[in-house]
């Protein structure tokens, strides 16, 4: 029996139902590195997964980076579930609606390769994984599988998926995606974090790490001065205002229809919204794994329907 593993291949992080790690990848060639944490051995080469951030790839299939990160994600999820390292897997992944039809065949082929099973070692454990199927679903909309009641409560709503590089927008009418309204803004969390880092450097001369900025944006502990914290919070509010303005300019009236916000940036916006923004209604699906969970539920639902035919 095969297992379903949902994977959200973000620009900023790779997420499964139980794991999340940065989408960075460092190649060490044939030389084993100093660490076993995140260490992937594949094809006679060594890679450390989750180390920092890699350059933005608009086409994730141009090299093997996201395939290697997929293997790491499978290994991490299998370990979390307590499953054997030799098993069959069905991958449920996603793409933005703005590029869904164009990129779906290529991304599916990229993840589903002919050489099966896939043999690799991750953090010292040998894996033999047979990838039986790869199913691709629309990002954001699939995440609503985790909160199906939302689709029944409102005739129209705006879905805002705040990812690492882009914020994907789409209106949903009577529980059906209005595909012609799909729009993508390059205002994801990478942009937010980079702008904050630059502003802190400009005002204080300090160079913050991504992790420090992320913690402060989430309201978590971080040893910095009150001045730095104030700059970060001010920039978080500025980012939120910019995002709301860009969304309105894209043709979505946030004063008239409810908005469902999800993805890694949703928690930032939730902490920096103000009553003076005058939004109709905001619903937050917090947690960076909702897309991955939604992909899994979507594939499970498709499988059930097929078995009933």
What is each of the regions a protein language model found here?
Residues 199:
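A contiguous pocket-lining binding segment that forms or flanks enzyme active sites
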Residues 1-157, 176-191, 203, 210-309:
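Nucleotide/phosphate-binding catalytic cleft detector across ATP-hydrolyzing
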């Amino acid at each position: 029996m095969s297992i379903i593993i949902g994977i959200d291949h973000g620009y900023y992080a790779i997420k499964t139902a139980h794991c999340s790690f940065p989408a960075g990848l460092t190649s060490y060639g044939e030389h084993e590195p100093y660490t076993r944490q995140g260490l992937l051995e594949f094809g006679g080469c060594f890679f450390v997964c989750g180390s920092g951030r890699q350059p933005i790839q608009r086409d994730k299939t141009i090299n093997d980076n996201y395939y290697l990160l997929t293997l790491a994600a499978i290994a991490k999820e299998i370990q979390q579930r307590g499953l054997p390292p030799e098993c069959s897997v069905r991958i449920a992944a996603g793409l933005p609606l703005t590029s869904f039809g164009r990129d779906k065949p290529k991304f599916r082929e990229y993840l589903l390769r002919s050489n099966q099973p896939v043999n690799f070692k991750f953090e010292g454990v040998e894996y033999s994984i047979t990838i039986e199927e790869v199913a691709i679903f629309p990002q954001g909309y699939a995440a609503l599988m985790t909160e199906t009641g939302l689709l029944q409560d409102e005739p129209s709503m705006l879905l805002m998926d705040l990812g690492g590089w882009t914020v994907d927008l789409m209106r949903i009418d009577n529980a059906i995606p209005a595909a012609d309204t799909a729009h993508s803004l390059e205002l994801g969390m990478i942009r937010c974090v980079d702008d904050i880092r630059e502003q802190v450097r400009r005002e204080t001369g300090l160079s913050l790490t991504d992790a420090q900025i992320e913690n402060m944006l989430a309201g978590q502990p971080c040893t910095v001065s009150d001045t730095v914290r104030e700059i970060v919070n001010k920039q978080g509010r500025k980012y939120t205002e910019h995002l709301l303005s860009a969304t309105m300019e894209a043709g979505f009236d946030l004063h008239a229809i409810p908005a469902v916000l999800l993805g890694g940036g949703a928690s930032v916006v939730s902490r920096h919204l103000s009553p003076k923004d005058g939004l109709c209604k905001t619903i937050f699906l917090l947690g960076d794994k909702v897309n991955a969970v939604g992909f899994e539920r979507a594939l499970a639902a498709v499988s059930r329907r097929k078995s009933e035919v």
